[in-house]
Amino acid sequence: MRKGSLKEVLAKIKHDPREDERDYYIVIEHRGAYGNEKKIPVEMIELGHGYFFIGETQIPYHRIIRVVKGNGKVVWEKRRRKQ
């Protein structure tokens, strides 16, 4: 499931001609949303150094919980802290 860093996974999805970014979405921590999670299609984001962008809005990478392919396969997931 977790192959490479988050930035590597997103860069591959965005720039590898064998991948179609329209087939992927990210799930971010979004307080106030149902379950405090929000899905965002990868095609809507632009990658930055410490943040990704949706239009003019900057969102830090640490808010990404998982990256999912449209078929439901999780390709990257944030490690959870042990309680």
UniProtKB/Swiss-Prot annotation:
Pfam families named among the record's database cross-references: MJ1316
Domain of life: Archaea
NCBIfam families per record: PRK04257.1
Entry's family note: Belongs to the UPF0248 family.
Official protein name in the record: UPF0248 protein TGAM_1209
Native source species: Thermococcus gammatolerans (strain DSM 15229 / JCM 11827 / EJ3)
